[in-house]
């Protein structure tokens, strides 16, 4: 098993960690980069891992820098499950569509006032993309073991902490 840091390294946003175990790929968190423009531009780059090769995502919590890239991942081909606690799912159902709405409003405003160098300015993702991502959520109770991908066991503990280990 190995882990690759795809975000939140050198910065505190864009949390994404790829766990590889044999042929399986698990993404821990799927966050947006936030802050100065060079960081935000990373959200528009080609995904750091082929979304269709990721078997599952585990969200430690709902903050946008941990969950906000999910609509992009789904739009680009992710078809697996997104495991999280009920509280995280509840918050994602608010945060992801709201984030999309804000991005759509920003793009509309940029187009109306002509201040974007992109013509037309587009949102990173839409409310429809956010709703599609929410369809992948699977809730897991605190302290219960689950197998997000073959060969890996995980469980959520208090706060935003979770454990991941090889299956026996």
What are the functions of these language-model segments?
Residues 21-80, 84-88, 95-131:
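Pre-active-site segment of Zn-dependent metallo-hydrolases
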């Amino acid at each position: 098993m190995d882990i690759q840091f795809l975000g939140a390294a050198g910065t505190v946003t864009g949390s994404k960690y790829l766990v590889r175990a044999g042929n399986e790929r698990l993404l821990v968190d799927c966050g947006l980069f936030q802050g100065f423009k060079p960081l935000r531009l990373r959200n528009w780059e080609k995904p750091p891992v082929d979304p269709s090769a990721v078997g599952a995502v585990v969200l430690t919590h709902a903050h946008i820098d941990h969950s906000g890239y999910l609509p992009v991942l789904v739009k680009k081909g992710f078809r697996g499950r997104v495991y999280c606690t009920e509280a995280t799912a509840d918050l994602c159902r608010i945060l992801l569509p709201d984030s999309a709405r804000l991005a759509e409003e920003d793009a509309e405003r940029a187009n109306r006032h002509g201040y974007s160098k992109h013509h037309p300015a587009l949102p990173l993702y839409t409310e429809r993309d956010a709703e599609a991502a929410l369809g992948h959520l699977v809730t897991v109770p605190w302290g219960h073991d689950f197998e997000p991908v073959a060969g890996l066991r995980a469980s959520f503990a208090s706060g935003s902490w979770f454990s991941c280990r090889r299956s026996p």
